[in-house]
């Protein structure tokens, strides 16, 4: 397995798919990385030369991925909660942040149901 940005990427998959195993790199970013490195998207990871791997590593190192990106996202959420804006309050209460309805759904964000006794009359 090749190791890029501290992540073992699968050897048997195409490079463009393997790069998406790194947090912060999606398909579009992976395609841009490979275009800049001059590597074909159809190449398998096991067929990459050390030189090509080095180019890819160099490009990925310039991006904010994995731990740095996770840290930045969590700090952004913390900042929203500290300044007390609407989005911060929604994060603090564990409710959907982006305006979704909460009357019926939002179970992922709200957690399992907590039924209240004697609700029906």
From Swiss-Prot:
Biological role: Located at the top of the head of the 30S subunit, it contacts several helices of the 16S rRNA. In the 70S ribosome it contacts the 23S rRNA (bridge B1a) and protein L5 of the 50S subunit (bridge B1b), connecting the 2 subunits; these bridges are implicated in subunit movement. Contacts the tRNAs in the A and P-sites.
Gene name of the record: rpsM
Biological process, per Gene Ontology: translation
MF term (GO), any: structural constituent of ribosome
GO annotations of cellular component type: cytosol; small ribosomal subunit
Pfam families linked: Ribosomal_S13 (PF00416)
Stored Gene3D superfamilies: 1.10.8.50, 30s ribosomal protein s13, domain 2
Region feature Disordered, mapped onto this chain: 94-121
KW DNA-binding (keyword) present: no
PROSITE patterns, A to Z: RIBOSOMAL_S13_1, RIBOSOMAL_S13_2
Family: Belongs to the universal ribosomal protein uS13 family.
Species: Anoxybacillus flavithermus (strain DSM 21510 / WK1)
Name this protein carries in UniProt: Small ribosomal subunit protein uS13
Top-level division of the source organism's lineage: Bacteria
């Amino acid at each position: 397995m090749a190791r890029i940005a501290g992540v073992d990427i699968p050897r048997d998959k195409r490079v463009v798919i393997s790069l998406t195993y790194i947090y912060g790199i999606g398909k579009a970013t992976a395609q841009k990385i490979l275009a800049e490195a001059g590597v074909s998207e159809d190449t398998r990871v096991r067929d990459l030369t050390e030189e090509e791997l080095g180019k890819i590593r160099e490009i990925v190192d310039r991006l904010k991925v994995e731990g740095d990106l996770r840290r930045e996202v969590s700090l952004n959420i913390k900042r929203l909660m500290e300044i007390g804006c609407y989005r911060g309050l929604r994060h603090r209460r564990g409710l959907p942040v982006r305006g979704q309805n909460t009357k019926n759904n939002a179970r992922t964000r709200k957690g399992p149901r907590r039924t209240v006794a004697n609700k029906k009359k």
